[in-house]
């Protein structure tokens, strides 16, 4: 499994090389957003296959950003690694804030996936030249506001801000606080986070500036260049100085946007006033952020079906199977070939309901389906489909109670479920494995699957038709 580390101030310098060349144009693909909103996003990072992997946890739900490649990074391999990490953790892969440019690849990647693309998530993207010039009739309103500001504030100038300007910034935040009208906890928290971002100017990650007039700052902004996009994390100005906001937008874009094609002024946070303001600056595009929640073929089932063969019935486990199923699960001698020790996941005392409860919970979560193998109504074993790869393949296993071994029941049950999985459930592939020294299982699997490869421990099989 991947090892994730929480995003901290120190981590920003580690994330920055990936975001510095990132071409996704969305604000979430920046070190500043990951750090500024760390308590909301609960972001953690890992590196695999030459790509940065960000895992967030929102409202208790784990979700990933789209992989950000470094030099030579393999996004396809990174996606597969994340899928495998989710499989091992027993959670479904969810990729959020996926840029529209990459969405087509993901839409074709998984057989079952739910896609969401909401207006409220979209970033406001502007041509850098448009904001730096405000040229043409469509920007006449902004120019009028700026002309008024310049007339009322002769000598006002834009200055870059560095760590040496802490005194100026301290005075500005005091002035801004005196005018700040919003009383909601969220607004107050956002202001505190904005102030904190200016304490990290020594990292070299951010571009910051302000409008200085008569020795005091009237406006400040802080941004981060990611690929060809300047992502504006903070914009604050004193409302009492009419026209200061459009003046700041233009001056900041003119000073820092020369090496950028795009300026991202982030989303509107579902705020009517922010949406109105951002639209007035005439965005060239709204940067879509798409969410992909990956499903599996088991999602289509309302209940576990009943299958029949010449001698057997395969159906859901019932309470009447408790004793026989517990005996099957507790047979350590036989289960050494099963490849799984229940003690690994057991938390607390082992109860008589534990094993049946696990099968029911796994099906409820649609991560596995367990069939009881019945001979004349008696439970003599199980066949399980589990370990899905989210791309149309699942692993299958079978075990038969020792007193019923040697009669071909395992082969009969295994073949029936494999056929059902391919032609009724709709899987693309069923895979299985057995220990190299497990000759009976090798013979069973060879009779109904294709032997594909071996390693030092296992022999592997697959069934496509």
Model feature map: region roles:
Residues 2-14, 137, 157-171, 313-327:
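A short beta-loop-alpha structural element at the N-terminal edge
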Residues 14, 217, 226, 263, ...:
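Acyl-donor (CoA/ACP) binding surface of acyl/acetyltransferases
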Residues 28-99, 212-241, 385-391:
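Conserved donor-binding loop and adjoining core beta-sheet/short helix segment
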Residues 74-78, 240-251, 404, 408-417:
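Conserved acetyl-CoA pyrophosphate-binding loop and the N-cap/start of the following alpha-helix
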Residues 89-99, 258-266, 424-433:
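Conserved GNAT acetyl-CoA-binding A-motif
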Residues 102-115, 269-286, 411, 436-453:
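Conserved active-site alpha-helix within GNAT-family acetyltransferase domains
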Residues 111-182:
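Acyltransferase donor/substrate-recognition loop-hinge adjacent to the catalytic core
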Residues 206-293:
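Aromatic (often tryptophan-rich) hydrophobic motifs at membrane interfaces
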């Amino acid at each position: 499994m991947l090892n994730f580390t929480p995003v901290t101030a120190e981590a920003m310098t580690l994330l920055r090389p990936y975001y510095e060349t990132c071409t996704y144009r969305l604000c979430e693909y920046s070190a500043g957003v990951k750090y500024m909103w760390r308590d909301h996003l609960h972001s953690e990072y890992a590196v695999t296959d030459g790509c940065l992997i960000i895992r967030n946890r929102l409202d208790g739900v784990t979700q990933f950003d789209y992989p950000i490649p470094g030099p030579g990074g393999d996004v396809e391999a990174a996606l597969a690694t994340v899928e495998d990490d989710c499989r091992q953790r027993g959670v479904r892969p969810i990729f959020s804030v996926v840029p529209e440019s990459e969405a087509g690849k993901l839409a074709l990647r998984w057989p079952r996936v739910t896609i969401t693309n909401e207006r409220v998530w979209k970033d406001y993207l502007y041509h850098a030249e448009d904001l730096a010039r405000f040229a043409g009739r469509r920007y006449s309103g902004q120019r009028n506001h700026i002309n008024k500001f310049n007339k009322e504030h002769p000598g006002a100038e834009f200055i870059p801000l560095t760590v040496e300007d802490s005194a100026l910034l301290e005075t500005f935040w005091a002035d801004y606080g005196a005018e700040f009208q919003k009383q909601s906890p969220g607004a107050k928290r956002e202001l505190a986070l904005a102030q904190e971002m200016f304490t990290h100017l020594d990292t070299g990650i951010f571009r910051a500036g302000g409008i200085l007039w008569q020795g005091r700052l009237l406006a400040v902004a802080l941004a981060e260049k990611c690929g060809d996009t300047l992502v504006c994390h903070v914009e604050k100005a004193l409302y009492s100085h009419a026209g200061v906001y459009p003046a700041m937008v233009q001056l900041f874009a003119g000073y820092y946007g020369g090496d950028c094609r795009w300026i991202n002024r982030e989303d509107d946070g579902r705020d009517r006033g922010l949406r109105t303001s951002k639209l007035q600056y005439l965005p060239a595009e709204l940067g879509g952020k798409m969410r992909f929640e990956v499903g599996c073929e088991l999602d289509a089932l309302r209940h576990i079906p009943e299958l029949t063969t010449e001698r057997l019935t395969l159906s859901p486990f019932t309470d009447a199977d408790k004793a026989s199923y517990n005996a099957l699960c507790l047979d350590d001698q036989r289960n050494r070939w099963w490849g799984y020790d229940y003690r690994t996941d057991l938390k607390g005392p082992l109860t008589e309901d534990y094993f049946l409860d696990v099968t029911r919970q796994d099906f409820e979560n649609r991560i596995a389906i367990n069939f009881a193998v019945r001979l004349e109504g008696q439970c003599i074993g199980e066949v399980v489909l589990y370990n899905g790869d989210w791309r149309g393949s699942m692993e299958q296993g079978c075990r038969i109670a020792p007193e019923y071994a040697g009669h071909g029941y395992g082969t009969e049950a295994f073949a029936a479920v494999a056929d059902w999985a391919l032609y009724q459930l709709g899987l693309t592939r069923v895979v299985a494995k057995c220990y190299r020294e497990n000759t009976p299982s090798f013979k069973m699997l060879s009779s109904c699957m294709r032997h594909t490869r071996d390693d030092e421990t296992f022999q592997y099989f697959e069934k496509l038709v």
